[in-house]
Amino acid sequence: MPKASDIKKGSAIEHNGKVFFVKEISKLTPSGRAGATLFRMRMYDVATGSKADESFKADDMINLADFSRRSATFSYVDGNEYVFMDSEDYTPYNFNKEAIEEELLFITEETQGLQILIVDGAPVAIELPSAVDLEIVETAPSIKGASASARTKPATMTTGLTVQVPEYIANGEKVKINTTEHKFMSRA
């Protein structure tokens, strides 16, 4: 059993007799000398989809839930449901738009490297690759010779994501975006 300080974003844990998927973790360090470091976790109940915020002391022991990862690709949208197809056995996995709203900013039909997390036979979350290639649909005109400066400008991708890009990048270009930091990495 790992300690709360060892739990990472994207883990499936057992808490109060239920299985939760950890979406966010923030570390709270009290200013007093005797205060213990707390880890605040935003979690989603796998069975109901309800949100829960819990705080754990750094040395609290937490049970990890059994889960598996399956390689998948985005297939199609059916109303409010997004359908992903297993890359090996073509099993469809449905997700409600609200459950994967943040991940949708990085997913296009060409996105490779998606992983579906499965707990008790049910899909609970999508794990993004570390970087994705997205096309810019709206940004200020590129400035010739701007490659020497480190200035940036906002650019909107086809998915609706807005990131800061160097001034020499133009509309229609494909760029590589870091999915954890939401930052421009390079041209694709």
Curated annotation (Swiss-Prot):
InterPro entries: Elong-fact-P_C, NA-bd_OB-fold, Rib_uL2_dom2, Transl_elong_fac_P/YeiP, Transl_elong_KOW-like, Transl_elong_p-like_YeiP, Transl_elong_P/YeiP_cen, Transl_elong_P/YeiP_CS. GO terms for biological process: peptide biosynthetic process. It comes from Aliivibrio fischeri (strain MJ11) (Vibrio fischeri). One of its GO terms (cellular component) is cytoplasm. It comes from the Bacteria. Disulfide bonds: none annotated. Coiled coil: none annotated. Belongs to the elongation factor P family. This is Elongation factor P-like protein. One of its GO terms (molecular function) is translation elongation factor activity. SUPFAM superfamilies: Nucleic acid-binding proteins, Translation proteins SH3-like domain.
